Amino acid sequence: QVPVLAVSGWNDCWPNTVLRLLDNVNAPCRGVSGVWGHVYPNLGGPGPGIDFLGLALAWWDRWLRGDDNGVMDAPALLAYLQDSHNPTPAPSARPGKWVAVNTWPSPEISAKTLHLGPNGLDEAPSVEDFDVEVFSPVWTGLTSGEYMPVAGICELPDDQGPDDALSACFDAAVLDHPLELLGTPLLHLSVTCDREEGLVAARLCDISPDGSSTLMSYGILNLRLRDGRDRVSEVHPGKAMEVTVRLNDLGWRILPGHHLRLALSTQMWPMAWPLAQEATVSIDLAASRLELPVLGPKISGTPTPDLGTPQAADPLPHRVVRQGSGSRKQVHDPLSQEHLLEVKADAGEIEFETTGLRYSSTSSQRYRIVEGDPLSACVEYRADFTFAREDWQVRTESLLVVTCDATQFRLDGRITAYEGTDLVCERTWEERIPRVAY
């Protein structure tokens, strides 16, 4: 019965938490879903940010001190609707508006059904039987951005065009009026698979008049987990399965002149680790449909409370010794057919003026996979941290490598600690995890 103030962002790795808590918590609960990633809401990244400090203090004053300050008079959910915009991986401000939802679930949100057909997405079901076979290269998904963006360099999804070209795409009609969405998109599919395991990745994209493709939401379903993540269900090659792909919750307003695209693939690397075998998934279009949570005009036109401007305490006095930097690049080796995604981040170096303590850090991520070989998938994470003062220095260096074979995942880790040039501690790990469902 603990009161809950649930706060997250559509670009976070947990965009569904707020609505699930509102659905299931019996204690006093309020939710705020902004547009930011895995950062505090006052920091934005992307913005707009809000006065999260004031919001949290008011909540604690009510439930820890007993102040009758009216926080429970606020709407059940405050959510940011992103407007259609060109794709950019940078954490810049996103256009849009806040909406207030007084109760959740809300009777003002209705399901709009679009049926899959040979000509795209349509409000009327297809009258002809038509199957589409989907088989995607193992490197499909490289434009999807980071799983947990923290307002770093180019972490958000880029133009989805390259991945759309590797997917089965279903486009809806161009809109002549805005379409406002808030909630959980659901994709109902009738599928068969030619292997004993398979994966379906679904992406919703906002297609602009110039053809650029902006990722709105995505969902991934391992067909062996179609009946729940707590059980493994067999996949019988050629046998039809009725499955539901739950896409991430979203708040989005598709503007006139734009249109919706559903892109389906059998890979989403590196967001999802590839299964041991490549598989072809066949979709019965006449038995498949997409349900969208459409916001009613009553909510859309309701004034929202002022969420304020970001507030925070002043940082400790410091000087910048070295500016931060970073890079993100994709490389395809045509000889080895390896695809490499490499992300580097240098947080720079700062010195705290009152103590003279200097701090710096660097990190890197390398995602490698070879065309046609799902067992070649390899991820390397490195992170180094250094503290120094005058002629004294300590640092840690860490490395994690994730690989696999047909029966297990391999996690090999190492961390070393130094004082000056002297190694003072070293530990290594070798974990082997059976591939039960993946």
Model-derived regions: residue spans:
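Short, proline-enriched alpha-helix->beta-strand connector loops that line the catalytic pocket
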Residues: 2-4, 27-28, 109
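Short beta-strand/loop motif that positions the catalytic acidic residue
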Residues: 6-8
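Acidic beta-to-alpha connecting loop that harbors the catalytic carboxylate
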Residues: 10-11, 36-37, 267
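Conserved alpha/beta-hydrolase "acid-adjacent" motif
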Residues: 12-18
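Active-site phosphate/pyrophosphate- and oxyanion-stabilizing loops and adjacent acidic/basic residues
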Residues: 19-20, 58
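Catalytic histidine neighborhood in serine/cysteine hydrolases
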Residues: 26-40
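Catalytic histidine-centered segment of alpha/beta-hydrolase-like enzymes
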Residues: 37-49
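C-terminal, loop-rich substrate-recognition/catalytic regions characterized by aromatic stacking residues
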Residues: 46-418, 422-438
